[in-house]
Amino acid sequence: MSIISRRQALALGIAAPALLRFGSAHAGTALKISHQFPGGTAAEGDFRDRLCRRFAALIQERSKGAMTAEIYPGSSLMKTNAQFSAMRKGALDMSLIPISYAGGDLAELNLGLMPGLVTGYEQGLGWKNKPIGQELAKFLASKGVVIITWIWQAGGAASRTRPLVEVGDAKGMKIRGGSREMDLVLQAAGAAVLSLPSNELYAAMQTGACDAALTSSTSLTSFRLEELAKHLTTGRAKSYWFMLEPLLMSKALFDRLSNEEREIILSVGTELEEYGRSAAVEDDVRVAKVYEAAGAKVHDLDEAVVQKWRELARETAWKDYANKSENCARLLKLAMETGA
């Protein structure tokens, strides 16, 4: 198996020390896991970083040291928006990333942040063992990526001047929606939209380029938006914004692993799904306390408000997505069968 050259690595935006090392379990397999979130420890910090660290510890333990993994937080290995395509090429081993970030290249993946489609954790995590999850996993595999851990997160909105709760509140605001489909809904509601990863939100809000940001409950605190926001709309009660943000692996690497290594990786990945769910739910509650302590006014959504957002999404984002291709229409139909 060849190792990519330093020139190739630099062309892909990979830090020089992160040249990939593959090998059999006997020789030792060292994985590189990249993500955009702040780094911490296995016990403290952003739960997505903690989940990656737990994954690394568990595969090392189960393989008796034959497999190891190094975590690169804060997009320190490569830029956020380069990570998915790098996995497809075999130039990055693993990433924990919002799947909709790849929706520009693979329209099907915008399903991972389709407003109003998933409105609860049980529904979202239920995708894995239903036709929608099986078909989505099959599609990803055909594009060179394997889902290791299914993670869903509810989200909310942090805003600088006025709250973003009702559909009508969006009019005239500059809002980061988090996906192309969410942007379509916001534009229909009268907002201007901007597209950027969550680790760039602080600067955008600080400069006034962004009035409000929709992002996961965890990112609302990890990126310290409470320092800038006067209002928070939470996802702790109800939400129309649920994001699929799995731990992924390059299929090029996965296919080179031994059967034993694959079994360890998949079993550990599955075991961590309940941890991801409970941590996400905890953050849905914790974010409100953090923003209240910072002096922001906190708002919650009720079913009537969520339904209005969902109705707008059905007429805009859902239709747009279904019209992209027969495959998009098929995936949306399967997702709707889970309870949307």
Region annotations inferred by a language model:
Residues 2-5, 10-20, 26-123, 132, ...:
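N-terminal secretory/targeting leader peptides
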